[in-house]
């Protein structure tokens, strides 16, 4: 089994901690909405490829400005060397944004349900919309209200074996889906750089995840 990929979510400008987890992770997620305007300087010092993300409040983000400014700040990452740009499926003008992104980077189209986990049929329809829009990577993240929600998000990955998918459930009840996502075929899983620096509810640290994966491989 190949080494499960971990993406470390950067939520502040603690460069020492960011570089400290580099041996454990495969890429970084730069959370522009959480870091603030210092994010630009930080990206030039990252030792691994990175995803640019400027999450909208409706999907769990903290961007304080307007939508036009949010997208402009996100697309600035193209000039700074982002390998992947995360754009929400619900973003207005998605086609035009993707056309700009695809000239320079891969596009991850994301969907977040902050309240519950839809049925597998609804999640499959969301995935189809992401693929039809031109996603290089599809991300479908829900909120676990019961243990079975973990199974649904992981099943979604198995339903699309030819595509690059990230799917898991947030919250305390969704922990197992985070761990298992890359083990059942998910493209990667997000992790916190350190305890207390979680980008979303239920996020595990990169160190904890790598310890688990090393035991699985033994």
Positions of predicted regions on the chain:
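Glycine-enriched alpha-helix->loop->beta-strand junction motifs that scaffold or abut catalytic
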Residues: 24-27, 47-49, 79-83, 100-109, ...
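Anionic-ligand binding region
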Residues: 122-130
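Catalytic beta/alpha-barrel core
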Residues: 9-11, 27-37, 74-76, 80-94, ...
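Short, charged, surface-exposed secondary-structure boundary motifs
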Residues: 60-63, 117-122, 198-204
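Conserved N-terminal beta1-alpha1 strand-loop-helix module at the mouth
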Residues: 1-71, 79
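Active-site-adjacent beta->alpha loops and helix N-cap segments on the catalytic face
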Residues: 33-48, 89-104, 118-122, 145-158, ...
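C-terminal alpha-helical cap/extension of soluble enzyme domains
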Residues: 158-218
